Amino acid sequence: MNFLLSWVHWSLALLLYLHHAKWSQAAPMAGGEHKPHEVVKFMDVYQRSYCRPIETLVDIFQEYPDEIEYIFKPSCVPLMRCGGCCNDEGLECVPTEEFNITMQIMRIKPHQGQHIGEMSFLQHSKCECRPKKDRARQEKKSIRGKGKGQKRKRKKSRYKPWSVPCGPCSERRKHLFVQDPQTCKCSCKNTDSRCKARQLELNERTCRCDKPRR
């Protein structure tokens, strides 16, 4: 079984190689409008470089980043995507019409097998040069946000009173103590007069009303 899968894999690889070699040889004839050492006319250069759908080789993993358990054959596919120049730094080449195309791709799962399946890819059919609105808006937002943040920080630092962090008066029975935030001095909530009214006396260490010692 493994031998058969390997044979199929190498046969497909050979067919792909022969197909690529055939088109590589035919390409100069198909696109041979210009001869060697010939000067390409301005209008031809302008039309071919302006914003338009251009065949681009796109990595499959770029379109399907979650399919990491597979190896794809081929690893990239030819897609029509917007590209070219807009002749203005404030413009960018963006798609205005799109459609999906389905292609047969070989999926290989190492040590498990392989199969040819259908995968959908996005293609651009129409492109236009449009203002970089989103990018400019984001830049303005980030600049504006930074300024507001700095103002808030300045306001906070201007009106925030200076204070020294105080340690707790006691780990146990904190509710019996009161602390001065300026001096960090701890004092008892109970008073000596309050303890005496109950025929008790104030223990300044624990801030509790204890029985008088005899």
UniProtKB/Swiss-Prot annotation:
One Pfam family in the UniProt entry: VEGF_C
Signal peptide: 1-26
Stretches with biased composition (Basic residues): 143-159
SMART domains: PDGF
Top-level lineage group: Eukaryota
GO terms, biological process: angiogenesis; cell migration involved in sprouting angiogenesis; cellular response to hypoxia; endothelial cell chemotaxis; induction of positive chemotaxis; macrophage differentiation; monocyte differentiation; motor neuron migration
Job of this protein: Growth factor active in angiogenesis, vasculogenesis and endothelial cell growth. Induces endothelial cell proliferation, promotes cell migration, inhibits apoptosis and induces permeabilization of blood vessels. Binds to the FLT1/VEGFR1 and KDR/VEGFR2 receptors, heparan sulfate and heparin. Binding to NRP1 receptor initiates a signaling pathway needed for motor neuron axon guidance and cell body migration, including for the caudal migration of facial motor neurons from rhombomere 4 to rhombomere 6 during embryonic development. Also binds the DEAR/FBXW7-AS1 receptor.
Species in which this protein is naturally found: Canis lupus familiaris (Dog)
Name this protein carries in UniProt: Vascular endothelial growth factor A
Keyword tags: Angiogenesis, Developmental protein, Differentiation, Disulfide bond, Glycoprotein, Growth factor, Heparin-binding, Mitogen, Secreted, Signal
Region (Disordered): 131-162
Glycosylation site residues: 100
Record gene name: VEGFA
GO cellular component, one term: membrane
